[in-house]
Amino acid sequence: MEFEFMTADTVLPPCMPLPTTMLRLPISNTAKVMYARLLDATLAEGTEDTNGILFVRFPIVELAAALSRSSVTVKRSLKELEDAGLILRVRRGVGEPNRIYTLLPKKEGCCDE
């Protein structure tokens, strides 16, 4: 991989969004990267539910491949995000991936420290 210095005119490569609030949360770095990936997927290819709220379907195996992590690690990180109130998983039928709603922190100081 080659690297170059940034200038004022440098065009950034594709990036994933990560709210700065996330940096202070007591969750693993894997969960933080997963949140950024889920938020990116929601913005890029989210599906609207009947209320107009965006969600994604991201099977565990695909999420594990996208993050280069094991399925066990992905499940643990999803639970971390759910416990922190950052995602909501809605279970579907047998063999169908869950709907994952990515929730946004309301403001910079919203989370317990």
Region roles according to the model:
Residues 42-104:
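Winged helix-turn-helix DNA-binding recognition segment
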Residues 1-61:
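Short recognition helix of helix-turn-helix/winged-helix DNA-binding domains
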